[in-house]
Amino acid sequence: NDNDMSIAENHGGMYRNLKLLRDTEGKAECNLFKAMGLDYVFVKDGNDIPSLIEAFEGVKDSKKPVVVHIVTQKGKGYAPAEKDKETWHWHMPFDPETGKSLYNPEGEDYGTVTCNYLLEKMQADKSVCAITSATPTVFGFTPDVRKKAGKQFMDVGIAEEHAMALASGIAKNGGKPFYGVYSSFIQRAYDQLSQDVCINKSPVTIAVFAASVYGMSDVTHLGIYDIPMISNIPELVYLAPVTKEEYLAMLDWSLEQNEHPVAIRVPASLVSDGKP
């Protein structure tokens, strides 16, 4: 399913070949999939059901692995989603007539807190950088913020393993990497966290977001397994703040120390000062 998007915009060399294949309707001589020995079928309009049926009928009895390259439009059929593809990758319950959310929490959230903190740190210290694996808005990095951060922001695409290993390398070379990731997705990078980061004692700061039954609401994305999964890895310090003040203090300490990898379990609620 090639809609020319990751969750945010695409990054990486592979996408240049996908664009070439789209532009040539699959006829380009340079074809990543054929180079790997795979059969290849191009579908120009993947939002057209008859075209999909025809393509699948043509390959269902194949005795070889086949890549069906389906070009689609993200958000097809719903104007707000077509206009703002990144925001509408997922959405809280909304009014289909207006596109407005039915749930509008009031107050400061930890994504905004993290964003403001990182921008200030980046301006004061060029060794600070922020890494995401295709979910930059989880820590408040909207397109405008990403432009402000410039080269101090890196989106590796949906590749949590690479994000973790990249952060380790930056830290070992004197940088101060911050990696923001959903709790549900950190499982994808377990090997890199254990071997690349923790065995090497790389002082990486990892912010674990949506670590709660309230963070994500579907079976595949529940953020409830991060504590048993990563808290027992040797050399990793796992912290769980309950207030904004604690969270910011932990970020400060983690980014400035160079002895341990540190993960911070970001509260899934709105910002609290801890008072009743």
Short names for language-model regions:
Residues 30-40:
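Gly/Ser/Thr-enriched, mixed-charge loops and adjacent short helices
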Residues 38-265, 270-272:
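Thiamine diphosphate
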Residues 276:
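A glycine- and small/hydrophobic-rich beta-loop-beta segment
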